[in-house]
């Protein structure tokens, strides 16, 4: 699949086009131009490092939404084995924007749950562009309860622009479903490890992100509202999205500094979509580290650790008059 380049990556796109053209020339002639191709590839690598070394928060948001970025099922295929998907909330329907099921991580049984956006138009429509309805969150909660019953660790993967705001979703109790998940996840007596792999959009993300450990990929985002939504409210114009992204502190390093995420998982040069397999290996290592740190804790200790983590959120500065 050809790489899709974002607007700020156009210098990279031009270099990649040159490399592609040279490959065609080499294939059709006896002239050896492999040295020139190698030089351009090195130049492309250096340029990618330069561009990605100084991304703005808004550019990071664009990378987090990249259409070729790995989704939950991509990581499931690379990191887990024996995945068996489970369907339905046992109350209304099966929401395909959230996927989940039993799997094995490093040979041990676990539960995997995550948002899924879809690759093509048909799949995106079926998965509602990764925006869950109430039945999606209720399915996730059902699987978490199942994992707790059998004492299985839970891995969740967050990648959603937000919960679906449609009339039907509201009629079926969208806010109740999200709130119940927050309440229930705080009291689960098994290890819960959450990873923001793309967009972490508000309550739609948080509903499967209450964990003992919260990881975040280097170019993922996590916020209470999208930059465009914030700009539309504050400045009455979505054109101010870059300014809003800066003010919202949506990037992984900022959120790590604020204590909202525990670990930032580095991505390959150019983002996870440039080398999904390398990204999966890096994430697998981080998930293994997080699970090892929690395996010595008993059920009550896991709950206490999770609650202490939640209670530590927020900062304030006392100023004397």
Swiss-Prot record:
Molecular function GO labels: acetyl-CoA carboxylase activity; ATP binding; carboxyl- or carbamoyltransferase activity
Chief location of this protein within or outside the cell: cytoplasm
Catalytic reaction equation(s): N(6)-carboxybiotinyl-L-lysyl-[protein] + acetyl-CoA = N(6)-biotinyl-L-lysyl-[protein] + malonyl-CoA
Keywords, in A-Z order: ATP-binding, Cytoplasm, Fatty acid biosynthesis, Fatty acid metabolism, Lipid biosynthesis, Lipid metabolism, Nucleotide-binding, Transferase
Positions of the CoA carboxyltransferase C-terminal domain: 39-293
Claim: Membrane is one of the keywords in the record: no
Location of this chain's protein in the cell: Cytoplasm
One GO term describing the cellular component: acetyl-CoA carboxylase complex
Pathways involved: Lipid metabolism; malonyl-CoA biosynthesis; malonyl-CoA from acetyl-CoA: step 1/1
GO biological process, one term: fatty acid biosynthetic process
Disulfide bridge partners, by residue number: none
Any Pfam family hit: ACCA
EC number in record: 2.1.3.15
Gene3D superfamilies in the record: 2-enoyl-CoA Hydratase, Chain A, domain 1
PROSITE patterns: COA_CT_CTER (PS50989)
Superkingdom of the source species: Bacteria
NCBIfam families recorded: accA, AccA_sub, PRK05724.1
The protein's assembly and partners: Acetyl-CoA carboxylase is a heterohexamer composed of biotin carboxyl carrier protein (AccB), biotin carboxylase (AccC) and two subunits each of ACCase subunit alpha (AccA) and ACCase subunit beta (AccD).
Function of the molecule: Component of the acetyl coenzyme A carboxylase (ACC) complex. First, biotin carboxylase catalyzes the carboxylation of biotin on its carrier protein (BCCP) and then the CO(2) group is transferred by the carboxyltransferase to acetyl-CoA to form malonyl-CoA.
Assigned protein family: Belongs to the AccA family.
Protein name: Acetyl-coenzyme A carboxylase carboxyl transferase subunit alpha
The species this protein was found in: Bordetella pertussis (strain Tohama I / ATCC BAA-589 / NCTC 13251)
Chain's gene name: accA
């Amino acid at each position: 699949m050809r790489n899709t380049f974002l607007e700020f990556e156009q210098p990279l796109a031009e270099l990649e086009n040159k490399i592609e053209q040279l490959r065609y020339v080499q294939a059709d002639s006896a002239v050896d131009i492999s040295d020139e191709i190698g030089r351009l590839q090195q130049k492309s690598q250096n340029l990618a490092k330069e561009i990605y070394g100084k991304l703005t928060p808004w550019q990071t948001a664009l990378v987090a939404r990249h259409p070729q970025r790995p989704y939950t099922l991509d990581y499931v295929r690379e990191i887990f084995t024996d995945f068996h998907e489970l369907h339905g909330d046992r109350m209304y329907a099966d929401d395909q924007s959230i996927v989940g099921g039993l799997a094995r991580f490093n040979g041990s049984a676990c539960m995997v749950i995550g948002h899924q956006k879809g690759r093509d138009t048909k799949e995106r429509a079926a998965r509602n562009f990764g925006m869950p309805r109430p039945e999606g969150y209720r399915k996730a909660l059902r699987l978490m309860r199942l994992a707790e019953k059998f004492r299985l660790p839970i891995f969740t993967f967050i990648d959603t622009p937000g919960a679906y705001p449609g009339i039907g979703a509201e009629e079926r109790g969208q806010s109740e479903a999200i709130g119940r998940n927050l309440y229930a996840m705080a009291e689960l007596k098994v290890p819960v490890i959450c990873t923001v792999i793309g967009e972490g959009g508000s309550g739609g993300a948080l509903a499967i992100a209450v964990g003992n450990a919260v990881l975040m990929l280097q170019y993922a985002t996590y916020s209470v509202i999208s930059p465009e939504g914030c700009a539309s409210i504050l400045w009455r114009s979505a054109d101010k999205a870059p300014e809003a992204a800066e003010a919202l502190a949506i990037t992984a390093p900022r959120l790590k500094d604020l204590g909202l995420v525990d670990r930032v998982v580095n991505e390959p040069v150019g983002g996870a979509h440039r080398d999904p397999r390398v990204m999966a290996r890096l994430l697998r290592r981080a998930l293994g580290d997080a699970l090892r740190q929690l395996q010595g804790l008993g059920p009550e200790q896991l709950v206490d650790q999770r609650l202490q983590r939640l209670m530590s959120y927020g900062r304030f500065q006392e100023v004397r008059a």
